[in-house]
Amino acid sequence: MMTINIEQLTEQYPLVKELIELKEVSWFNPSITRLEEGLSYVGLGSEDIQDASQRLKRFAPYLAKAFPETAKTNGIIESEVVPISEMQSVLEREYDTPIQGRLLLKKDSHLPISGSIKARGGIYEVLTHAEKLAIEAGLLTESDDYSKLLNEEFRDFFKRFSIAVGSTGNLGMSIGIMSAKLGFSVSVHMSADARAWKKNRLRALGVNVIEYAQDYGVAVAQGRKEAENDPTCFFIDDENSQTLFLGYSVAGERLKKQFDEKGIVVDAQHPLFVYLPCGVGGGPGGVAFGLKMAFGDNVHCIFAEPTHSPCMMLGVHTGLHDAISVQDIGIDNITAADGLAVGRASGFVGRAMERLLDGYLTISDERMYRLLGQLNEAENIQLEPSALAGMIGPIVVTKSVEYRARMQFDDTVMGNATHLVWATGGGMVPAEEMDSYLKNR
C-alpha cells in the first residue's frame, strides 16, 4: 500500500485540494483522444459487444417468461428515453444559464427486474455464468430455446453452485434477483451505506445478505475471500469484470436505435453529451464504451460523482487510478448517493477509458436532493439521489468556456446538441423511502 503525501499531491494537482475541501468541481481532460487512438487501451471491441448482444437475445425467451414485466419487450431489458423540457427550464432559471440544445433523460432508473442501471451488467454476468455452466454440463446448446431454463432440472443443477458479490446496493439487487430466479445459492456482501429496503427485498427472495459496518471496498474484499475458499462459488468482481462491463456496453447500440427511431441526429455538428453517475466505474464505463462504439467521436461522456466520493476523478486526474482512495486524502466516502459511495475507483475502467471520457464533475448531497425534488415537481419522475448526479451536467458544460473552445463547440453547434442525463436508479424505491428523499430537499 503506497503512502500518499497530500502536500506533494496538492502541489502537483491543485484540483485535489478542492476535492479535499469537498467543493463541487469539474475537470475536462485535455488528454482525451479520438476513438481510433483510445480504443486499443480498452482491450475490447465491437465484436465483444456483439457477442454480449447476441447472448442477451438468446436469453430473451427465458427472461420474458421468468419476469413477466419484460414480456412486452420480448425479454429485452431496456429503458425509454424521455424529453424533460420542464426540468430544462427549471435548471435554466435556477442557474441563470440557458441550456442550448435539448435535454433528455435515460430511464435506467425504471429498467425491469431490478430498477437500476445494474440490471444491465449484473444480470448479464449472471446469465453468462449460467450459460457457461449449462453448456459445459451438456444441458444447453446455443441453438436451444433458452426458456427451457425454467425447467426444474436446471434449477436443481444451478443449486449446486453459488454466486457472491460485494455491493453498495443496486448491483447486489440485480445479481441477487437474477441468481435466485435461476436457482443459484447467492450471497450479497453489503456495505454500510446500503439501504435497508434493498437488503430486505433480497432476503425475501432467499438471498444471503451479509452486512458490514465498513464501506464498499471491504464488502467486495470479503465477497472475493468467500469465493476463493469455495470452488463452486463464482465471484462477480465489480472492480475488474470485463463481463459486467460488456453487459453495460450493449446500451450504446440500443440507444442509437432509439435515437434513429426518434429522428435524433448525432454527428460533428449535432453533438451528444451524456452525463453518467459514477461509483466504482463499471456501469458508466461500460455504457460510455458502448456509446463510443455506437456514436464515435460525436458523443461526449462526463462522469458525475458525489463530493464525498470522487474516486474516479481523483484516480484519473492524478494518474494513480486504484492506487489511491478518497480516504487517503481525508475524504470520508459518506454520501446520500449510496450507489456512488465508493472510495477507490476501478483500475481497469480508469485505465481503459481515461482517453475516451471528456470530463468529470462532483456534486453535493444537498444539490442532488434539491434536483430530486425539482424533477419530481417538474416532470413527475421519481429517482433515488445518486441518479441525479448527472443532472447538473448541462449547466457545467455550458459554463465551461475553456472546454467548449478547445472542442470547438460554438453556439451554433451547442444549439444542435442533445444532452442526455443517465438516470441510474429509483424505480423500485418504496413509497415511504421516496417520501423521505423528497422531504430532504
Curated annotation (Swiss-Prot):
HAMAP family listed in its UniProt record: D_Ser_dehydrat (MF_01030)
Stored InterPro entries: D_Ser_am_lyase (IPR011780), Ser/Thr_Dehydratase (IPR050147), Ser/Thr_deHydtase_PyrdxlP-BS (IPR000634), TrpB-like_PALP (IPR001926), TrpB-like_PALP_sf (IPR036052)
Pfam families: PALP
Co-factor(s): pyridoxal 5'-phosphate
Catalytic activity, reaction form: D-serine = pyruvate + NH4(+)
Gene that this sequence comes from: dsdA
Annotated keywords: Lyase, Pyridoxal phosphate
Lyase keyword on record: yes
Family: Belongs to the serine/threonine dehydratase family. DsdA subfamily.
Entry superkingdom: Bacteria
GO molecular function terms listed in the Swiss-Prot or TrEMBL record: D-serine ammonia-lyase activity; hydro-lyase activity; pyridoxal phosphate binding
Record has Lyase as a keyword: yes
Residues bearing the modification N6-(pyridoxal phosphate)lysine: K118
Protein name as annotated: Probable D-serine dehydratase
Record EC number: 4.3.1.18
Record GO biological process: D-serine catabolic process; isoleucine biosynthetic process
Gene source species: Vibrio cholerae serotype O1 (strain ATCC 39541 / Classical Ogawa 395 / O395)
Coiled coil: none
